[in-house]
Amino acid sequence: MGDEKPVIVMANRERDRELLIPVADSGDKDDGSSSKPSSSSSASSSSHQSSHETLSLFIRGWASKKFMTGCVILLPIAITFYITWWFIHFVDGFFSPIYAQLGINVFGFGFLTSIAFIFLVGVFMSSWLGASVLNLGEWFIKRMPFVRHIYNASKQISTAISPDQNTQAFKEVAIIRHPRVGEYAFGFITSTVVLQNYPTEEELCCVYVPTNHLYIGDILLVNSNDVIRPNLSVREGIEIVVSGGMSMPQILSTVDKPLASIDRATSL
């Protein structure tokens, strides 16, 4: 009897072991089947998240692009209106205090009075008496140490855009080959010079090439035959320089050499 009990116990243990093994296998199978749905759900969530990020990036890029387009369109309009409004207020401020003392507080009267005053000054300075007064005033200004430099610079700018062709500083717009071969510089013809050091006299054009500002630049003497004259007026050339070349037309065509210059060259 004592020997049968260990045998029975061993048999029970073997039976329990056989019963436990399938149970463990089935548990492993259940774990594998349950891991598949979890992995598929994580993959679907990651794909949904990536699509959401792509959509958000697209919306943000589209919105920023449209916003910058609106800024590009509205910025020059806003700057133009702001400068115009500031200029009207600035000019109106010269005579509006006089009207305010008289009890007239109508906006625009000072501006109209300033415009009329500028027109009358132009009419007066065009006469012989006005020119004499202007020369006398310039004589005093040019003897002031610091003021004369400011006056000369501002006068050069105003003379450059003067409608009087006789006193206009910039005669024509010019394009010259400078500083190296294959490169061109944009400038203005200010005068013509005849060089007599050579066996045959050579006509040179004095070309002013602005560097940073309109009143700062280099003066180059270029043969008149090497000067390219585009179909641009002086005002258009000044706009190109002030805008940093952004207002340059896409296509430029050249014009013929002025007849006066040709006749002068042939007479030499």
Swiss-Prot record:
Topological domains annotated Extracellular: 92-103
Gene that this sequence comes from: COV1
Principal location: membrane
Keywords: Developmental protein, Membrane, Transmembrane, Transmembrane helix
Family per record: Belongs to the plant COV1 protein family.
Tissues expressing this chain: Mostly expressed in flowers and stems, and, to a lower extent, in roots and leaves.
Stated name of the protein: Protein CONTINUOUS VASCULAR RING 1
Function: Involved in the regulation of vascular patterning in the stem, probably by negatively regulating the differentiation of vascular tissue.
Locations listed in the record: Membrane
Transmembrane region(s): 71-91, 104-124
Record region (Disordered): 21-48
Pfam family, any one: DUF502
Cellular component terms (Gene Ontology): Golgi apparatus; membrane
Ranges of compositional bias, category Low complexity: 34-48
Membrane topology: Multi-pass membrane protein
PANTHER family named in the record: COV-LIKE PROTEIN 1, PROTEIN CONTINUOUS VASCULAR RING 1-RELATED
GO biological processes: stem vascular tissue pattern formation
Disulfide bond entries: none
Resulting phenotype, P76S: In cov1-1; stunted plants
Record topological domains on the Cytoplasmic side: 1-70, 125-268
The UniProt record lists the keyword Plastid: no
Signal peptide location: none
